[in-house]
Design a protein with these regions (language model features):
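CheY-like receiver
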Residues: 116-134
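Conserved active-site segment of CheY-like receiver
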Residues: 10, 81-86, 98-99
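Conserved two-component signaling phosphotransfer/partner-docking surface
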Residues: 101-107
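Conserved phosphotransfer microenvironments
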Residues: 36, 49-72
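Two-component/phosphorelay signaling modules centered on CheY-like receiver
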Residues: 12-31
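A short, hydrophobic beta-strand element within the central beta-sheet of small alpha/beta folds
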Residues: 67, 76-87
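Short hydrophobic/Thr-rich beta-strand motif most characteristic of the beta2 strand and flanking loop
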Residues: 7, 27-34, 42
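Alpha2 helix of the CheY-like receiver
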Residues: 40-43, 106
């Protein structure tokens, strides 16, 4: 089963998030939210996601507050914070990446969900080699 991540992004809701595209191109399932409140609703509806990718520049609430709200209902949920400066203004999340580095984002995702990511790689290799096809 593919890993599923929630991307909480400050981009315009009608646009396609770059981070979402990066994760989808790596064969992950991606849910999106554009506000803290929307992120909380999504995580309540889909509690078994593998992690959250959080833009630290969300409008409306400081990122530390958003993380606190998310942690209220999902204490151990891995959160990858993303900021343009490369430093974590939210208070020391375990995973932090620069906004403009897709490789860093994918590496953080692999660290969060290594077993499920290895399934994705294995399945992709099977498809490419023709193994397991009908």
């Amino acid at each position: 089963m593919r890993p599923c991540f929630l991307v909480v992004d400050n981009e315009y809701p009608g646009s396609i998030s770059t981070r979402k595209l990066v994760l989808e191109s790596a064969k992950l399932n991606v849910l999106t939210a554009y506000t803290a409140d929307e992120a909380i609703r999504v995580i309540e509806r889909f509690p078994n996601i593998d992690g959250i990718v959080l833009d630290t520049q969300l409008k409306g609430r400081p990122c530390a507050e958003v993380i606190g709200l998310l942690r209220n209902s999902h204490k151990n949920m891995p959160i990858i914070t993303v900021s343009p400066s490369g430093h974590d203004p939210c208070g020391g999340e375990q995973f932090h990446v620069s906004t403009f580095d897709p490789k860093q984002l994918l590496e953080a995702v692999r660290q969060i969900s290594p077993t499920r990511m290895s399934y994705v790689v294995k399945r992709e290799n099977e498809i490419v080699s023709g193994v397991g096809s009908p």
